[in-house]
């Protein structure tokens, strides 16, 4: 069954619900969702959950504050008939502006990656060359706003996007290159905007899996 695409906010909430279940073993409450996302009221979280339910991503169970059941793991949105969307470019060196539209589709099933890939981004630069992410590669990305230390992430810093290895340390976030000639990007989220756009789950080079 084909499901409707999610808005950015709906995707953020869906990812948080999944992450909360994976890390705690139970769904979050509306209060916990509101606190995490920044809503002033749990009612706002409730409305977004209803939208997710209407689109077929979750089931809302009555009679409990944690009555949320995941129905889909985004696999169906990744594995569509057109293949994976190729969205803009990502700098693996100096960050460049992300292009927020689909340039084309690539004939590959996102479910072949683990976790599944939701889109592809073209790499520009060699800052991740030590781990085999090279200039011109297509980076398979699982769309999520949550990542662990050490994962290779697609991160938006202000209005630019880059691929780096994530490290959260104290109040700062370090985006480390895999190139000895380059320095990490250091972000203070108290004064700079940063958002995780996804985690790298694979690389396609010259039409072949890497």
From Swiss-Prot:
Residues 30-50 bind DNA. Its EC number is 3.4.21.88. It is an enzyme of class 3 (hydrolase). Keywords: Autocatalytic cleavage, DNA damage, DNA repair, DNA replication, DNA-binding, Hydrolase, Repressor, SOS response, Transcription, Transcription regulation. CDD domains: S24_LexA-like (cd06529). The record marks 92-93 as: Cleavage. The active site is at residues 127, 164. It catalyses: Hydrolysis of Ala-|-Gly bond in repressor LexA. The keyword DNA-binding applies. One of its GO terms (biological process) is DNA replication. GO terms for molecular function: DNA binding; serine-type endopeptidase activity. The keyword Ribonucleoprotein does not apply. PANTHER family: LEXA REPRESSOR, LEXA REPRESSOR-RELATED. Represses a number of genes involved in the response to DNA damage (SOS response), including recA and lexA. In the presence of single-stranded DNA, RecA interacts with LexA causing an autocatalytic cleavage which disrupts the DNA-binding part of LexA, leading to derepression of the SOS regulon and eventually DNA repair. NCBIfam families: lexA. Belongs to the peptidase S24 family. Homodimer. This is LexA repressor. It comes from Actinobacillus pleuropneumoniae serotype 7 (strain AP76). The lineage of its organism: Bacteria, Pseudomonadati, Pseudomonadota, Gammaproteobacteria, Pasteurellales.
């Amino acid at each position: 069954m084909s499901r409707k695409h999610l808005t950015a906010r709906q995707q953020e909430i869906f990812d948080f619900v999944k992450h909360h279940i994976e890390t705690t073993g139970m769904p979050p409450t509306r209060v916990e969702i509101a606190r995490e996302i920044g809503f002033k009221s749990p009612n706002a979280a409730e409305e977004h959950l209803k939208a997710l339910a209407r689109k077929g991503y979750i089931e809302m169970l009555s009679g409990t504050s944690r009555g949320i059941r995941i129905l889909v793991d985004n696999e169906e949105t990744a594995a569509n008939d057109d293949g994976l969307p190729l969205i803009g470019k990502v700098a693996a060196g100096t960050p460049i502006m992300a292009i927020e539209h689909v340039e084309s589709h690539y004939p590959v099933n996102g479910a072949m990656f683990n976790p599944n890939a939701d889109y592809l981004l073209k790499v520009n630069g060699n800052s991740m060359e030590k781990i085999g992410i090279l200039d011109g590669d297509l980076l398979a990305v699982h769309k999520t706003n949550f990542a662990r230390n050490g994962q290779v992430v697609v991160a938006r810093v202000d209005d630019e996007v880059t691929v780096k290895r994530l490290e959260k340390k104290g109040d700062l976030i370090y985006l480390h290159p895999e190139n000895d000639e380059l320095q990490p990007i250091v972000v203070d989220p108290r004064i700079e905007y940063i958002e995780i756009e996804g985690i790298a789950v694979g690389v396609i080079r010259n039409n072949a899996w890497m």
